[in-house]
Amino acid sequence: MTIISRLLPQRRSARRANGHRVYLCTGRSKAEIYDELWAIGLDGMIGGNGCYAEEHGRVLFHQTLSAAQCRAVVDWLRDRERAFYLECSSGLYASPRFREKGDPVICLYQQRKGKTGQSVDQVFPHMIWGVCLYRDDASKISFILEAPDDARQAPGRQRRAGAVNLGVPGTDKGTAVKRMLAAISGSVADTIAFGDAAVDVPMLRTCAINVAMGSGGEQARMAAAHVTDDVERDGLAKAFAHFGLI
């Protein structure tokens, strides 16, 4: 999210005038793509780390956990008294203690990104509380780690600082890029990927040109053929200019 938001408005206009399209490829669900992000001028998005895609409001594909899979995971988490939330296109749905247990983890995660002072309510301003968590439209379920066995036992897991994501098996950003291209009659040869984290590696390896942010993690930088400047030093805009996008 930080990557694309750092592109200055005039450069966004230049990109569009040159006929290029920009798609957000993120771990976030559709419900987490707030108006200020769409206002950047995105042509579409891949969400849920590859579970969902749309272009100009048209849904291209949407994979979710089945109702039975969701129930099994929710019961697994409740049995262990873990705090969690469901990520759906319709919204984010939290377990009762997610705010209490989530604040310290959010703080740690933000500190690792050079930010401080944010809480669950600030990071997830539209979180939905107090509803049934047995659903058939969840793309991912994220929960807070409290024991080493959590990470080992959780099925379909993708780990980050203090938390684990449980998602649809067999999906990642790379396969989603290919699937989106097939849906919009696009070609891999025309793609450029920008990433900064381990979860971006399949996308970087899929696209014709792959760029890691200088401020990104080691796995992303090792997977990319090109490394641009840090996000906070206009690395994205510099890469756009370098590759003739603006």
Each language-model region and where it sits:
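Short, acidic loop-to-helix structural element flanking the phosphoryl-transfer center
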Residues: 2-20, 62-71, 110, 168-182, ...
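Active-site phosphate-binding/coordination module
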Residues: 7-101
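Residue-level signal for inorganic ion chemistry
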Residues: 15, 26, 49, 131, ...
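Phosphate- and divalent-cation-binding pockets in alpha/beta enzyme and binding domains
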Residues: 32-35, 143, 176, 202-203, ...
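Short, structured coil segments at secondary-structure junctions
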Residues: 40-41, 49, 147-152, 206-207, ...
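Short hydrophobic/aromatic-enriched beta-strand-loop microsegments
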Residues: 42-50, 63, 156, 210-214, ...
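Conserved acidic, metal-coordinating active-site core of Asp-based
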Residues: 82-206, 215
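Asp-based, Mg2+/Mn2+-dependent phosphohydrolase catalytic module
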Residues: 206, 210-246
